[in-house]
Amino acid sequence: MVTNPGGGSTDAGGGPVRHIPVLLNEVLAALSPAPGKLILDGTFGAGGYSAAILAAGAEVIALDRDPSAIAAGQAMVAAHAGRLRLIHAQFSNLGDHAPQGGLDGVVLDIGVSSMQIDEPERGFSFQKSGPLDMRMSATGVSAADVVNRAKVADLIRIFHFLGEENQAPRIAHAIEKRREEKPFETTRDLAGLIELVTPRKMKDKIHPATRVFQALRIFVNDELGELAQALFAAERTLKPGGRLVVVTFHSLEDRIVKKFFSDRAGRATGSRHLPAAHERAATFTAIGKPMVSASEAEAEANPRARSAKLRAGLRTDAAAEAADMSLFGFPNLASLGKLGG
């Protein structure tokens, strides 16, 4: 998966680039698939990870919230004679599709997929004009709904927190003024306004609309909430010795994964001022280095790998802890809800 909403995946000749699984060797090393093991791939996409896991002899349960990914994956299902189950589902609900404490591994590749970015009609990229949609599935509010109906204060919160956009107030007020005249309908429409009110400077490496598009996509698909719930579900479904491997592409996602593994490493409750009443048993221990990033060679061959970070944990035999969303400290932006209505 990738995060750059500018999209534009082309090779040197200008043609489309085939989907290349990011950090594939590192994922396999951390996941350790083998015959007799059951691995859940929570983000099937184009099937890159699933194919490699199957090639190692393991069985795979694969999930994807995008109906087009499920349709495209049917040929792979047919080719693997009962060793691959492909299910249309969000990875936050992975516990509904796997035996409790029965998985040997879970792999999550967070963010929008290359295929989604490369399809203008999905509305993820501003490089080609398409409907302002950004939904990974066909349900829920679209990016156009948010841009055209959300209160200015809510737009500012979304752009600032989910996009880390310093110009959030200026952009939000410009959106409000423009939508009174005409609603936003296309990706180019919104990107053009953002570029007008926050023009690109010579030192800027990204398009002025990049962070706003990222924020809208994350909000529309509740990506941070989905990730947090998937981590809790993986904790419940992995057997002792099972492996959780997560690949992220921007700092907000990585912060959640890092916080989860740090919290689940086990420590005494309390502080030096208030002695702990008991030790918390670790539910995960680290696998290898705390964080792995792409090699320079991979980043050169696949620029989308440059921002990727991998974190992995080994499940202990301690009981799973409560799923407490307050652990991550981010506001419940999904509750903004009424979009000004």
UniProtKB/Swiss-Prot annotation:
Entry similarity comment: Belongs to the methyltransferase superfamily. RsmH family.
Domain of life per record: Bacteria
Keywords in alphabetical order: Cytoplasm, Methyltransferase, rRNA processing, S-adenosyl-L-methionine, Transferase
Catalytic activity: cytidine(1402) in 16S rRNA + S-adenosyl-L-methionine = N(4)-methylcytidine(1402) in 16S rRNA + S-adenosyl-L-homocysteine + H(+)
Biological process terms in GO annotation: rRNA base methylation
Enzyme Commission designation: 2.1.1.199
Record localization: Cytoplasm
Protein purpose: Specifically methylates the N4 position of cytidine in position 1402 (C1402) of 16S rRNA.
Entry protein name: Ribosomal RNA small subunit methyltransferase H
Lineage: Bacteria, Pseudomonadati, Pseudomonadota, Alphaproteobacteria, Hyphomicrobiales
Residues holding S-adenosyl-L-methionine: G47, G48, Y49, D64, F91, D109, Q116
Pfam families named among the record's database cross-references: Methyltransf_5
GO cellular component: cytoplasm
GO molecular function, one term: rRNA (cytosine-N4-)-methyltransferase activity
